[in-house]
Structures are given as C-alpha cells and as structure tokens.
C-alpha cells in the first residue's frame, strides 16, 4: 500500500536501501517515445550518493537497467521496468539501530505499523527509494518537453539561514549545476558549502528549502476540487523523505497582503494571450494552470541520522543513548533538487495525459 502514484501516468517504486536493488514500474507511458538509458542516467547521476564532499560518502554508480517496455530505443506503451542494483552496502553499520530507534526517523513508526522492519539503512524509508521516482521523472520530463516544451528546474533556495537570490523566471539548469550545492547564487553557494561541511564535521545536520519552477505549462492542466494541480504537486513533493513544508506562489507571505495587493491583474500580451501582470498565484488558479510559471517551494528538515549522541529508546521500551553510525548526508538539499523536479514532472505529465484524454477528444 502507498507505493503507487499517479492516474494515467502511474509509477510504482520498489526496493530497500540495503537490499538487492531499487527501481520502478511505469504504467501509461505513451508508445513511440524515444528514450535511452543514458537520458535516464543523467538524472540519476544528479541524485546519486558520493557525488561531492557535502553528500553521503556511500559510493554507488546507480547504473540503471531498463528491463521492459522499451525496444530499439522507443517505448512500447507497455509497463516500463527500471532497476538499479545496490552495490556499496554496509549493513553492519546499522547493527545498533536494529534495537535503538533513531530520533525523528521512521524506525519507530514502521515498527508501530508493521511490527517488523528492515533496519539496514532504513529499508524502505531510505532516500534510495527515490531512485525510482527520479528515473520515472526523466521519462516524464521528456514527454513534457516533446509535447509542450515544458521545462522543470529546481534549485537550492535556502540552507539553514542562508537564502539565495534567484529569479525563477530566468534561472537555467547550467546555473543550478555550476556548483555542488545546486544554488544558482554563486556567491552564497560557497557559504552554504562551508556551512554544510562545518555541520558535518560536528556530527550534525541542517535543512533548507528547494524552490522549483515549471515553465511553459499549458493552460488548463489540473482538475477542480480534490485533484487540483497544486494539491497533487503538494502531495507529490511532500511524499519525499525529509520534506516538512510546502508553499506555492506567494505562499504564507501572501497572508500579509490585502486582496487588492495580492490579486494578479490581467492584460492581453502581443500574441493576444491572457496573461497576468504579477504571479502571486504561482501559475495556478482554481486548481488549474493559467499559463504562467508554476513556482513552488519545499522545506526539508535536517537529516535525522546524526553522529551526535541523543536520547532514545529501544524496541523493548528501555531508555538509552544513540550516536548513529553509517554514511549519511549532512544536508539532503543538494540531492533533493532532482527529486523535487521528478515529482513535479510526474504530476504535470499525468495531468497532461488526463487533460488530453478528456478535453482534447472532440
């Protein structure tokens, strides 16, 4: 239960951190889409561990294998299965955590729900589960580009109290990928990297905010009431490990404005299209895309597994102390960027297919 996401473009992820591998099955991908393992690998490389000095030192190539659904470089319209095998596992690092719960991790809640858990690396609750999401997101991104020239770009907006100045309307992928923290504000990026390194040396962790923009989203994507576009995006990104907050457009800052100040006034552009002067709605009104850029932010908490000693309890209910071992990110934000992009792309791709299926038939 809870392992499948989407309606027409639907994914099911599988696997655990220290099991044989992780992956995804994608249902509903249109046939005849040209896709290669290399295109998927580009996205996986952006989220893989061990990519820089500020990420987990776990060394995984995360090489993807397309097992089904693609023939001679084109999708068949049948389920696409993608597998990434785990290579650099160290289950012995987690022996102590078989009995001791990590504070603010999923250990205790998984035990409460299932009565059993794979304690090696967090099992299913590990961020390695997101490999399947990012692989599927690579395919969703290609569909969006090919059909509607949609581009989805995420970046680190804030690390702890360091907040970058970035224009979501003009930011480019090259700017995002110009440094290891994935903050397009180059000057602040250096300070972010230094802060992450310093925190990691102290055996601690920090969080922050990823901002994401989707440009050229067709007007009309989204559904009324329960399947509003922003509601589906919120569910998608809030299902990511360590996510703790979501806002779109003006977000919580919009509560400080009056209606006159907040409303996005309309005008007709040079092509005769209805546009808005401002974009405090974040590209969505009434749950439906209005053609402006969709701009959202996701808050990620500090990584739960840290080397500093903390109070905790055992499975048997005894109070104890834990200084966690293992290899963990001192800050999840740099690797969370492609995860957020993937989830936004999956939602937009699903709604694109739903919109065409209902509103482009007659």
UniProtKB/Swiss-Prot annotation:
Homotetramer. This is Chorismate synthase. Keywords: Amino-acid biosynthesis, Aromatic amino acid biosynthesis, FAD, Flavoprotein, FMN, Lyase, NADP. Gene3D superfamilies: Chorismate synthase AroC (3.60.150.10). It comes from the Bacteria. Coiled coil: none annotated. The gene is aroC. Belongs to the chorismate synthase family. NADP(+) binds at residue 47. It holds the Pfam family Chorismate_synt. It is an enzyme of class 4 (lyase). NCBIfam families: aroC (TIGR00033), PRK05382.1 (NF003793). It comes from Nostoc sp. (strain PCC 7120 / SAG 25.82 / UTEX 2576). GO terms for biological process: amino acid biosynthetic process; aromatic amino acid family biosynthetic process; chorismate biosynthetic process. CDD domains: Chorismate_synthase.
